[in-house]
Amino acid sequence: PACAVAIRTAMVAPAAADKYNPAVRRPTKGQEASYTPTNILVTGGAGFIASHVVIRLVKSYPQYKVVCLDKIDYCSSLHNLDEVANYPNYKFIKGNILSADLIKYVLDTEKIDTILHAAAQTHVDNSFGNSFAFTENNVLGTHVLLESAKSIGIRRFIHVSTDEVYGSSYQDEPSRREGDVLEPTNPYAATKAAAEAIARSYWFSFKMPVIVTRGNNVYGPHQYPEKVIPKFVRRLVKEQPCCIHGDGSNSRHFIYVGDVAAAFDTILHSGVDGEVYNIGCDDEHTNLEVARKLVRAVHPDRAEGDDLIEYVPDRPFNDVRYYIDSTKLHALGWKPVVSFEEGLAKTVEWYKKVSADWWDIGTDSALAAHPTPPAGVSNSLVQDVPSKL
């Protein structure tokens, strides 16, 4: 059975054969941290956030080799990486993190010392109808990667999680800090909480140098338009209304992707092993407020734009808001610099220019009020490994 095959392929050498020496530890809590990578593997690097991280690292640090591993799912695109495709310090490998043989091969042959793990299924709506695929990719995929990384003695492993693991926040509650209890409320968030729990266990059990990040809602160029901001922009360009879940009062903190790429740059070089870092901002807006701002941006001649707002049934469960404290990351020298208005303007401009074929499978299904993965998208446990890397 496929599941049995997946479990067999995920097995790696016994712990006794691991190259990682737990006696050699990087700075711990309260210590100065300064880290210089050599060869970086970015998983999910053709996706939204990770593609911006790849571009930043490739361009800013020509002395680093950046290897991007991505299976090119429906929401990823090699076009996201066009601007670095010909850089000598960049390499792309098509492959799936569920294949331990492939991961071990890449880590060995590319002499990887640093991993930024962003590969994941991330769309909450999809997790309500196909949660098993989220467990496969987000939990098992992370576990496969951690075991392979441990076996080669990885020097830094950054695990990308989400603020959704904290669960819903309410107006009278303080902001969530990194040590707070995790209370995920949807299958996507639950798999991300499980994945980061496994990642952190490798720090506690083996002193493997793991860092976890939890970010706010990110927006900007390259994002597949199943997510709220690009979906609304694409619909408005087509003269279709923004589809508001419920009454539109649910709020989110929206942070521009360029600021998030800068945060990962900071964490890569200055983060402390074993720590968790929230990546957040102060730009909180309800979904209805976002829709109205986008109506004005796309159709400035229709100031009210009520005909471009449509209310649809809410998700099975929709968190009221997420509110996180990023003080720990600020102490490393990072703060967001792009305002919501500036970020929205850049985002609208990009989506107006780019056609739907930026993504191989198109975007029609993504523009539905409650999108599901496009027909024909495979959720098989282990996909084919390319014969040539």
Residue ranges of each PLM-predicted region?
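The catalytic Tyr-centered alpha-helix of NAD(P)H-dependent dehydrogenases
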Residues: 184-191, 215, 221, 225-229, ...
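Residues in well-ordered alpha-helical elements
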Residues: 101, 113, 125, 132, ...
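C-terminal substrate-binding subdomain of Rossmann-fold SDR/epimerase-dehydratase oxidoreductases
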Residues: 14, 18-20, 24, 33, ...
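N-terminal Rossmann-like NAD(P)+-binding domain of SDR-like oxidoreductases, especially those catalyzing
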Residues: 6-218, 336, 346, 353-364, ...
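Hydrophobic alpha-helix immediately C-terminal to the catalytic Tyr-X-X-X-Lys motif of short-chain
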Residues: 194, 198, 202, 232, ...
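Proline-centered turn/helix-capping motifs that create local helix->coil transitions or kinks
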Residues: 158, 165-171, 207, 223, ...
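A short, amphipathic alpha-helix embedded in the catalytic core of nucleotide-handling enzymes
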Residues: 57, 202, 231-236, 263-267
